[in-house]
Amino acid sequence: MRGEGESWGAITIVCGLSNGKGVAAGIDLRVKAEVEILDEDKVCVESFVLGRREEIGVKLVESLRDLLRSRYEIKGGIRAKIFSEIPPERGLKSSSAVSNALVIAALDAIGERVDEMEILKMSVTLSRMAGITRTGALDDASASLLGGICAADSRKMEIIMRKEAPELPVVLRIPDRRVPTSSVPDLSNSSQRFDELFSMAISGRWMEAMLLNGYLMCSLLNYDRKIIDEAISLGALSASLSGKGPSFAAICDEPEKLLNWGDVVSMLR
């Protein structure tokens, strides 16, 4: 039994790490997963990032085997191949994208058809089982799978809002270093400020909320806010630290003006 699945990256509009309520926007960096159900009880993972072999998704695949066993009584093991355009642990929602793609591929392999919300619930469960998320990151998972601007309450497992994203380029500034979620301090003391940004975003002022989120996250995590100021001065419509960093994202209509600021040009999707 074999199956395929795909999902995409996303950027942060409002970070949900403080209270589980976040907003994210899909971008067109893709993750593809191939899953084969094995007779033998073992897990095999091959993974490639930007065409180069790199270990990602092992904990997710191990947890996927357990999830399929408990939910669908699928015995045996899993062989998975993961092909990602998203550098891991850079704040660009690679974990959510890999989790989504693996769930879709596994369901395809066993012949199960479920709706998008059920895919998201399984993906969040998978991420929690693998221990790679604090909140469940439903906002990231939904933006990754569905595209558009997605606001969600991960603790209540509710999508609060989804709207189509404008057709605008996104310039990404992606440092070489990784920042695992486990290294990020507790942000719960700032939950009221993030609540205000969440309300601003779902009221329609999501670009303004994104910018203010960037300044707040830079202050809390000791990033240089001048990186955001530079993007705005070069014509960006909005910019922010994405997730817990270290990547920054700038939404713009003239990406060529930011090519010296960033590394990768993507698109909202």
What feature does the model see in each segment?
Residues 1-90:
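ATP-binding N-lobe of GHMP and related small-molecule kinases
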Residues 3-8, 34, 38-39, 110, ...:
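C-terminal nucleotide
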Residues 8, 30, 76-77, 138-139, ...:
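Short coil/turn connectors at secondary-structure junctions
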Residues 11-15, 31-35, 140-144, 149-151, ...:
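Short beta-strand scaffold segments in enzyme catalytic cores
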Residues 71-79, 106-123:
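Phosphate-handling active-site elements
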Residues 92-116, 145-147:
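DPxDG-like acidic metal-binding loop motif
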Residues 117-161, 228:
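Alpha/beta catalytic cores of group-transfer enzymes, especially the acyltransferase/condensing modules
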